[in-house]
Amino acid sequence: MRYSEMFLPTEREIPSDAEVVSHQLMLRAGMIRKLSAGIYSYLPLGYRVLRKVEQIIREEMNRAGAQEVYLPMVQPAELWQESGRWEHYGKELLRFRDRHDREYCLGPTHEEVITDLVRHEIKTYRQLPKNLYQIQTKFRDEIRPRFGVMRGREFGMKDAYSFDADEEGAEISYQKMFEAYKRIFARCGLRFRPVEADSGTIGGSFSHEFMVMADSGEDGLVFCATCSYAANLEKAEVHPPEKMEISNDEMLLLTEVHTPNARTIDEVCAFLNVTPQEIVKTLIFNADGNPVAVLVRGDEEVNEIKVKNYLKCQELELAMDDMIQDVTGAPRGFAGAIGIKKARILADYSLLNMKNVVMGANKEDYHLRNVNEGRDFQISAFADLKVARETDSCPRCQGALKFARGIEVGHVFKLGTKYSKAMGASYLDKNGKEQIMIMGCYGIGTGRTVAACIEQNHDENGIVWPMPISPYQVIITPVNMNDKALAETAERLYESLAGKGAEVLLDDRDERAGVKFKDADLIGIPIRVTVGPKKLAEGKVEVRLRDTGETSDVQVDSVEKMILRVIEGKMSESYLIF
């Protein structure tokens, strides 16, 4: 491709509304342009990268035995009503009516559509297993789209769905996709880590996220320094302390203390001269309309996802003031466990050995000292309900936990029968008995993968593309197109390399060399060949590698072999898994 013919509007200034590096560089490098909030057009350079990511995905999905389909983006409401998600999905689901007043939505995901397709076509165990995938546009009406294509409203996704006759087959399908995802992200040149994750609105029994390691990542991830345990922060478990018996002699006299206007942990600590570790926080939650009291140590935070999963409720939120008043008899800020009769009381493992702690008195402007579980109140159950911290131990081996930031680019779910049972996706087994299919689903954000790659591969000058997904492999830069010798040498190299299968961009613009070099660095092409008068007089050109900055002067008649060798080497580097 000739630069002069390409639609490639680069920018020098950093866009003021771009918060993260990938958004800034995708705009500056002429990869995308914003149409509306969370909705972007891909320009030729960006689309080349996107297509390369999609091609890697297709190759690995096909290799794993999946078959590509293409499903409608517009989905009828009745399918979502069958699955039960029409009521529960929330405002991210864009709903509308057609001219006949029939309700539809723009698909944020395709579990309902694929289940409907399969239930009508698969009737017997002989037709199983099946794994169907597509690369399609999705729409989620995010309340706050941000970070460019990282969190847009309209976005591309590869979603696959497996259907199996039994749990054993479903596990095999899950592992095939898990391994395929590792190959996909490795081939894209990403440093990544699979982590245990919550299944969220998709549902299912368990899932893994594939996290690209990046300091700018929205998601926290936790991993063990000793064993292979890894999870996102929402899912991360901690090893509970060993339960110790507390004798009656150790329990001090329960005392009520006047604490005017001391509502927060910091305020109570200052007023009573205690540490947060000596305080029990009592949070009242509304779980599907029912109050639940959750206790956690004062220096810890409640993990609402863990609470929701423990209770197996559909909706969980912090209680409003009227529910808190009804349950505790006091306003917000003075809740405690003693005397609560209208709510279950759950406690985090961090309180297993609590002794003589401070707690709200369920009375405005009062707290209690020397509270002891068992003597003063009863707990319904202890569970892992807090957000993991670096001081916690690995739930598998008790090793030290490490924390990092990451960007979720893929998610694999074992759905079980959540959708197949609700929508009647069944088959006849070997004995002619009707059985429900076991499902899995597997998603990759295609544009998100591109953005995550930039977050991980850039410097102060621009993008540093891994070879496998770079829009071009080589950029040839004659410093002066009006110099006949330089122009002819650049043309010959361009034609020769392109003829050997290399993807080459020839910068044939009538621009200063400095402008060309800045643009080459900005768009991140891995190999730059500079054709200049001094080197050419010696029969040489300069070859520069974008990732290392290494330069070498190479004879014109041998530069082609050298470049092809570098391309081959850098393509194979991508198979290293973090």
From Swiss-Prot:
Major location (coarse): cytoplasm
Family of the protein in this entry: Belongs to the class-II aminoacyl-tRNA synthetase family. ProS type 1 subfamily.
Pfam families with a match to the protein in the record: HGTP_anticodon, tRNA-synt_2b, tRNA_edit
Record field: catalytic activity: tRNA(Pro) + L-proline + ATP = L-prolyl-tRNA(Pro) + AMP + diphosphate
Recorded name of the encoding gene: proS
Protein name per UniProt: Proline--tRNA ligase
EC number: 6.1.1.15
Keywords assigned by UniProt, alphabetized: Aminoacyl-tRNA synthetase, ATP-binding, Cytoplasm, Ligase, Nucleotide-binding, Protein biosynthesis
Gene3D superfamilies, sorted: Anticodon-binding domain, Bira Bifunctional Protein, Domain 2, YbaK/aminoacyl-tRNA synthetase-associated domain
Function as written in the Swiss-Prot or TrEMBL entry: Catalyzes the attachment of proline to tRNA(Pro) in a two-step reaction: proline is first activated by ATP to form Pro-AMP and then transferred to the acceptor end of tRNA(Pro). As ProRS can inadvertently accommodate and process non-cognate amino acids such as alanine and cysteine, to avoid such errors it has two additional distinct editing activities against alanine. One activity is designated as 'pretransfer' editing and involves the tRNA(Pro)-independent hydrolysis of activated Ala-AMP.
Domain comment quoted from the record: Consists of three domains: the N-terminal catalytic domain, the editing domain and the C-terminal anticodon-binding domain.
Localization of this protein: Cytoplasm
